[in-house]
Swiss-Prot record:
Signal peptide: none annotated. InterPro entries: Ribosomal_uL10, Ribosomal_uL10-like_sf, Ribosomal_uL10_bac, Ribosomal_uL10_bac_type, Ribosomal_uL10_CS_bac. Disulfide bonds: none annotated. This is Large ribosomal subunit protein uL10. SUPFAM superfamilies: Ribosomal protein L10-like. Keywords: Ribonucleoprotein, Ribosomal protein, RNA-binding, rRNA-binding. PROSITE patterns: RIBOSOMAL_L10. It comes from the Bacteria. The gene is rplJ. It comes from Picosynechococcus sp. (strain ATCC 27264 / PCC 7002 / PR-6).
Length: 175
């Protein structure tokens, strides 16, 4: 038995709510995936703050209708579509999907939308090669730490150099 109108309206509202906070949505063809594999994909996406929604293309069309940011996704709505919706950490979500696809070899990335711009599958894959948010934080913290360490070494070096110079002069005069 199909879903009731209330169920469909609830699903559309849920998709709209997810899209409200999303940075990236990409569409995959999930044909041939088992329920266990879809659950595995969802579990891989969850730590990245991303979601996998499976809905009829018409329901996704209704969910994005009137929202200029997500309009380009309509061109990707065909066949069996799963919608991967990523929040802040786009790179981690794409990496999680790429790992899943490598493990299952069953899905096809059609494309996606980011900030109102349609993206090809190659562009989305390139996003997965970027460092994650945590990696960027680590790189920034390391750079800041390196600068402060160099300043501290420089500040400590001035009195040390002065002391060595005074000692060398005093030893030279004593000799």
């Amino acid at each position: 038995m199909g879903k009731s109108l209330a169920d469909k309206q609830e699903l559309v509202a849920e998709i709209k709510d997810l899209l409200k906070d999303a940075q990236l949505t990409f569409v995959i063809d999930y044909k041939g995936l088992t329920v266990a594999e879809i659950t595995d994909l969802r579990n891989r996406l969850r730590p990245a703050g991303a979601y996998c929604k499976i809905a009829k293309n018409t329901l996704m069309h209704i969910a994005v209708d009137g929202d200029e940011t997500w309009q380009p996704v309509q061109s990707l709505l065909k066949d069996s579509s799963a919608f991967l919706i990523a929040g802040e950490d786009v790179a981690s979500a794409v990496k999680a999907y790429k790992e899943f696809r490598k493990a299952t070899k069953k899905t096809e990335l059609r494309g996606g939308v980011m900030e109102g711009q349609a993206l090809t599958s190659d562009q989305i894959e390139a996003l997965g090669d970027l460092p994650t948010k945590d990696q960027l934080y680590g790189q920034i913290a390391g750079a800041i730490n390196a600068v402060t360490a160099k300043i501290a070494i420089g500040i400590n070096e001035v009195p040390g150099s002065l002391a060595r110079a005074i000692k060398a002069v005093s030893e030279k005069e004593a000799a």
